[in-house]
Amino acid sequence: MPITLDPEKLAIVMKHRFQYKICRECGARNPPNAEKCRRCHSKNLRPKKFKKK
């Protein structure tokens, strides 16, 4: 994927790649508005980390 994307496409990519939550216990991906994990029903969720280069 090219690095030089237009801002609209970059916003779409960032939304789909980084707007979800990760369960700290089982590692499952959950929707951004989740309060409990879909797999293990834990409430220990964190937002997906974004690493800048």
Curated annotation (Swiss-Prot):
Classification via Pfam families: Ribosomal_L40e (PF01020)
GO MF annotations, alphabetized: structural constituent of ribosome
A GO CC annotation given for this chain: ribonucleoprotein complex
Organism classification: Archaea, Thermoproteota, Thermoprotei, Thermoproteales, Thermoproteaceae
Keyword Disulfide bond in record: no
Gene: rpl40e
Domain of life according to the entry: Archaea
InterPro entries (alphabetical): Ribosomal_eL40_arc, Ribosomal_eL40_dom, Ribosomal_eL40_sf, Ribosomal_zn-bd
Family per record: Belongs to the eukaryotic ribosomal protein eL40 family.
Keyword entries, A-Z: Ribonucleoprotein, Ribosomal protein
BP terms from Gene Ontology: translation
Name used for this protein in its record: Large ribosomal subunit protein eL40
Entry annotated with the keyword Ribosomal protein: yes
SMART domains: Ribosomal_L40e (SM01377)
